[in-house]
Amino acid sequence: MNYIEKINNLLKPKQGGSPLVLDLFAGCGGLALGFEAQGFETLGFEMDNDCCATYKKNLNGDCIQAKIDSSYQFPRAQVVIGGPPCQPFSVGGHQRGVRDARDGFPAFISAIEQAKPEIWMFENVRGLMYKNKNYLEAIVAELEEMGYIVEYKLLQAVQYGIPQNRERMIVVGHRGKFEFPVAQKKKVTAGDALGDIAHLIHITE
């Protein structure tokens, strides 16, 4: 089995039915894909029409097209995940942080408060841990007041079976039963991922 077949098999959505996962700022459903592969039911929230359409096409779960904020009414769910807009904290987005109108954390915190999940997680750029660390600590403090144990860690994609150097900060809130995955020693190369495609002859004429 080559890498592409392995990934397609691993991430193939499974019919589960429960528990429910709310996927905020869902994009095309990259985070939800992993949860559906483990049998979870997902419900995405995304303001971009094309992203929502892609979500519905590739996943079993529905996607609600909406621009969410702290006043949005969310349903109860066992899990909440999301990728709050990272432009406020990324180098490419000029790192305006909490002064940026694109900040999605008020909506994410509101969803946690309403849904009361057993566990939640969000991913973001490493800039949130450094230049905007005070804001991260404020977010953590607010979520800890809701009774969650909050842990965060920088994870490098290439150490988890992905042929890409991509570092992201993963933040998890739980009730006492969670461990970050152990990094893999063996790395997947671009050649492994592309398979026979990597050996095709480039024709210029």
What are these regions (language model features)?
Residues 2-116, 126-129, 134-137:
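Core alpha/beta nucleotide-donor-binding catalytic domains of modification enzymes
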Residues 70-78, 87-205:
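Class I S-adenosyl-L-methionine
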